[in-house]
Amino acid sequence: EMPDPQPQAAPSASEEEPPAQDAAQEAQEEAPSSTGDPKIDALIQEKDRALQEMRRLNDAIEDEIISRRIDQLEDTTGKIIDQVVAHPEKLSQIRTFMNYYLPTTLKILNAYDRMGAAGVEGANIDGTMGRIDAMMDKVVEAFDKQLDALFADEALDISTDITVLEQMLAQEGLGGMQMGQS
C-alpha cells in the first residue's frame, strides 16, 4: 500500500505544467520587445491586446452584421499597426487612432456585448444597440481611412516617379503612341 502515494505525486507534477505553459507564453509575449524601440514595443503589445479583445467580442456577439464589422476592424487595425511597426516614423500619425478611436470602439462594442448578453428588451437598450449598429459602418470607414492615410506619402512618391518616368519616355521618343509608329 506504500506505492499508492507515489503515483499521486505524478498528478502534482501535471499540476505544475500550466505554470510552465504560462512561462512559455510570457516568453512569447516578451519576444516582440526585441525591436529596441520602447514605443514600438508598446504598440505591438497594444495591437495584441486589442486584437485579442476584438476576437473575444466577435465570439460573444451573435449579430452577424456586427460580427462582420468586427472582422473588418480586426483586419484593418492589424494592418495599421503593422505598417507603423515597419515604419516607426509614422507613429505620430496614429496617435489619435490609438488613444481615442480604438479604445472607444472597443468600449462601445463591450457595451453592445453586455446589452445583448443581458437578454433584456427595452427602449434604452434597443435604442443604444441600434445606434451602435448604425455607427459601425462609419467606424469601419474611419479605420480604413486611417490605414489609407499611412500610405499617402508612398502614393505621392510613386505618383511623382510615374510622372518623371512618363516624361523621360516621352523625351526619348519611347512613350505613348510613338512606340507603335516606329
Predicted regions span which residues?
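Soluble C-terminal extramembrane regulatory/interaction domains of multi-pass membrane proteins
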Residues: 65-182
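Membrane-proximal, non-transmembrane interface segments of integral membrane proteins
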Residues: 1-83
